């Protein structure tokens, strides 16, 4: 009635998939249970999608459904590793999530590091197939920041006319090392996940911290 956005789970683990199949035997796949009730639409967010096959992913792309990738939760609950590389290659909208229940931390830097680690494991156990290539540091950082921002209609990065949403990070508090290139500094910030590096948080142009 109110066209509100919907957020739920999809194909998180084997037991959940079997449970949904038992509840809705008329649906061939998990995603069809949402479609049956009019919830499979643009703006819907589905968390996990660990076991979403090609057909389910295609249904997500065509409907404009987003993926909330929660690697830390998926590891903690031994659900598996989501096919993030395939999702990105197929044009799905993906952003990182912490999962307040199954995840160990709310930090998006931690989520980015976990996403990289999980994707490397998937890449290795796939036999290092190119279509399962692991996430790079810039890709994971993008998924933790600008990717989610686009869900709310803002352009990626800093665009003229958009409200400013930013976090100011200062890596001088981290242990000294040899001189680092900008890409190496970003990598260290992500893997260190040290709250001391956060100097300011700005939302809609207003400084919160």
Question: Which residues does each PLM region occupy?
Answer:
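Histidine/acidic residue-rich metal-binding segments in metalloenzymes
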Residues: 1-66, 78-94, 156
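Short, acidic/turn-prone active-site loops that include or flank metal/cofactor-
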Residues: 12, 71-75, 100-102
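A generic structural signal for nonpolar/aromatic side chains embedded in well-ordered alpha-helices
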Residues: 34, 60, 87, 112, ...
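Thr-Gly-centered strand-to-loop micro-motif
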Residues: 46-48, 69-72, 96-99, 204
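Short glycine-rich, flexible loops that bind phosphorylated cofactors or substrates
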Residues: 54, 75-76, 103, 176
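Short, charged, surface-exposed secondary-structure boundary motifs
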Residues: 76-81, 105-107
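C-terminal cap of metal-dependent C-N hydrolases
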Residues: 163-209
